[in-house]
A protein has these predicted regions:
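Bacterial N-terminal signal peptides that target proteins for export
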Residues: 1-10
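Domain-level detector for secreted/extracellular nuclease and nuclease-toxin modules, and
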Residues: 14-246
Length: 246
């Protein structure tokens, strides 16, 4: 076997190892319908016609990617009994808000295109989507650049909604959340819970404990972490180890 073949095999083994590690950190599903795409995994809630969570690994390489937006919004054929359609958002007054943002999926054409499945969308107030939610997305990308690799879980809180839109009755969450885990060293975790409305407040005002978010959603976000690590990280809302200013 030549050196090129050996290096190729080593890279393949490393990629498989990373993918396996990411899958091991999946949140629990309250719906039983877990859908795996190449660069993210989701748990779909049929009664709300959207995902209760989207989970993915975000690396500095992904953030540095140059793939342009594809804007190819479409139903996710991997979802059983899928009925959510573009028509549901038309003239609704709500944005098709990304859960896993397109800005995180610039690695290649596949990652970018997959981010436009409607299963990765949720109805968001425009000022929220363009405002504080976008600010949080940009901040998460900065953390990925600093940390090299982080894990993100995000979604709307489906236990509380503002009504429905469209013929398929897509729920409008009152709140959206993100949980970010940095596995380096002893690990650190931070969680946000933000109302689906315009806000001028700083992101720090919306930091909550992961424990409180789990109680609200019924989801265990990182069940495969050792209990000693999980219990310590999920009970804290200390922001001192997370940069908000650069």
């Amino acid at each position: 076997m030549n050196i090129k073949s050996i290096l190729t095999n080593l890279v393949l083994i490393l990629c498989i190892s990373i993918a396996s590690s990411a899958q091991e950190l999946l949140p629990t599903s309250t719906t039983g319908q877990i859908v795996k795409h190449t660069y993210y995994t989701l748990s779909y809630c049929e009664k709300d016609e959207q995902s209760e969570w989207v989970y993915y690994e975000l690396t500095s390489e992904m953030v540095k990617g140059r793939q342009p937006r594809t804007d190819d919004y479409r139903p996710d054929e991997k979802v059983s009994n899928v009925s959510e359609q573009l028509e549901d958002y038309r003239h609704s007054g709500y944005d098709r808000g990304h859960l896993c943002p397109a800005g995180d999926m610039k690695l290649n054409l596949t990652s970018m295109s997959e981010s436009f499945y409607l299963s990765n969308m949720s109805p968001q107030v425009k000022e929220f989507n363009d405002g504080i939610w976008n600010t949080l997305e940009e901040r998460v990308r900065r953390w990925a650049l600093t940390c090299g690799r982080i894990y993100v879980v995000t979604g709307g809180v489906l236990t509380s909604n503002k009504g429905k839109i469209g013929p398929d009755r897509v729920s409008i969450p009152k709140y959206f959340y993100k949980v970010i885990y940095d596995p380096r060293g002893k690990g650190k975790m931070i969680a946000f819970l933000i109302p689906n409305e315009k806000s001028e407040k700083p992101l720090q005002d919306y930091v909550v404990t992961v424990d409180s978010l789990e109680s609200l959603t019924g989801i265990d976000f990182f069940p495969e972490l050792p209990d000693s690590i999980e219990n310590h990280l999920e009970s804290s809302k200390d922001v001192s180890s997370w940069s908000f200013h650069k």
